[in-house]
Amino acid sequence: MTDLGIVASGVRRSFGAVQAVREVNLEARAGAVTGLVGPNGSGKTTLLLMLASLLAPDAGTIRIGGIDPVAQPDAARAILGWMPDALGAWPSLTARETLVMTSRLYGLDAAAAAGGAARLLAEVGLTHLADAPARVLSRGQKQRLGLARALVHDPRVLLLDEPASGLDPQARIDLRVLLRRLAAEGRTILISSHILSELEEVVDDAVFLVEGATVSSDRVAAAATRRRTWRIRLADREPVAAVLPVAQALGLDAALIPIDRRDLLVGFAGDAEAASALAALVSAGLPVAEFAAATGLLEHTFLDLEGGRA
């Protein structure tokens, strides 16, 4: 596929006196999964609706694979797969009929629509429910059907709003594998999710949205590198007994090391300092059973940005 992606510059959108999107500037690369991260009410869904050509911005420009979705909505939709948070399917149609109908609306002939529906149902693990009405599907099953529906016309760009919502652990793993494969095929994928631990395992890049505006790369970088808490657990003793030897090995005050269940919590200013601490623990002969960041980098950055809001 050609090097297509998503570009938004100076995008704004208001609803009456409410500024849902104040100033959005973002790029999503082809062949990569980009995460759209922000709290409730930050404007993520409004932004996705504008990118999907379903809502016009008040100001700014949007390009989907080089196409302006405001001036050329049909051309943009031809290369765009949109998965909203809620399925919005025809409740009386079966899962198979939903995909066939959507394919036909995109101009596929009957044979291609039927074949594509069968393939996509298998890819999202719904073959056994192919002939079940959409209304009887669970929340997670509807999410999988929504993803399949977004893929019926082999789009180059995917916009996914909370695709992991309602999925069980195995289905989430399957979703990650599928998204990585789709990105490897050259697609541009922009995904919004509140499940930051899941998002971290699939994204290549992240865009942070706070109070309707994208956060500058400098501010994101500063947040990502601030002091971060790590979990430490020794294999041969309980946490209370581990505090003193860990503190001595790291040159810390034992009274300042908190305990969370089986782990000690220690803050380090970056990965290099954490790596040096691990080396010090091992050199001191301590049997380290766990040494890991307490939160993922996405969550750490998000929480730091949230804490820094005015």
Predicted features by range, described:
Residues 176-268:
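ABC transporter nucleotide-binding domain
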Residues 154:
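Conserved catalytic motifs of ABC-family nucleotide-binding domains
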Residues 52:
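Helix-to-loop junction immediately C-terminal to a conserved catalytic motif
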